[in-house]
């Protein structure tokens, strides 16, 4: 594919999204996110050769929220391997991202690492043997390394906002603790969790960080192997089946790519062998996924023939 076609397609989609009035609703249960301008939109595609096609607010940082769960899972698998799956499953939940219902039925084992309970369990594993500040520093440095950008930071105002209002997450963590799923003090685990969800990145930085997932675990520009090809495929499989809460099936149906959303309005998507894609629009749909983000990605895969299920 020519870079001219990619640039033109991204620019056209960004222009189309800017003109739409159906933008969804910003997350209002996290006070800092409720203040975000709903008119924002950014899109970045980085192809296998490292060419960057950007449109809209491509360099405006936003709160990545649950997209961080892809990277904490990657770290945890590197530390503990398959022991991760003793704490968390690999099945779609079919329920809201902060639901406690399945934890009650399944003795505190979360369905997958991308719902809140699952990500808290994964965070607890990363924290084990470390102080919270050390674990959080490891996560942040990993993100900076993947994006090749040491300027990536944590938005402390967002983290504090989540800590003040994250009662449902506290309930999830305490419930898992009662079943012995968490090893560390709940307050420590939640502190690290809230802070890695509050990492702020632009679409450009996020697409760069996700490149290893599009290329069999390897960054094609640096040649660095982040994970094995098999592990990259398995992370992508989980992103496809579980990456969008109870909207994962709809995303797979319409977009046809592995992806992970966050309530900050971002989506990281992977076109295996082709590109890493990041889109941001803060208005959400009923499942907590970016409304225009999904529409933009559907348009992108249709026009470029990138769905993993065929043209």
Swiss-Prot record:
SUPFAM superfamilies: beta-lactamase/transpeptidase-like
Subunit structure comment from the entry: Homotetramer.
Catalytic activity: L-glutamine + H2O = L-glutamate + NH4(+)
Cited Gene3D superfamilies: DD-peptidase/beta-lactamase superfamily
Keyword Calcium included in the entry's annotation: no
EC number: 3.5.1.2
Family recorded in the similarity comment: Belongs to the glutaminase family.
Source organism per UniProt: Rhodopseudomonas palustris (strain BisB5)
A Pfam family the protein falls into: Glutaminase
Keywords on record: Hydrolase
Keyword Hydrolase: yes
Binding-site list for substrate: 66, 116, 162, 169, 193, 245, 263
Origin organism lineage: Bacteria, Pseudomonadati, Pseudomonadota, Alphaproteobacteria, Hyphomicrobiales
GO biological process: glutamate biosynthetic process; glutamine catabolic process
GO function term, MF aspect, one: glutaminase activity
Name recorded for this polypeptide: Glutaminase
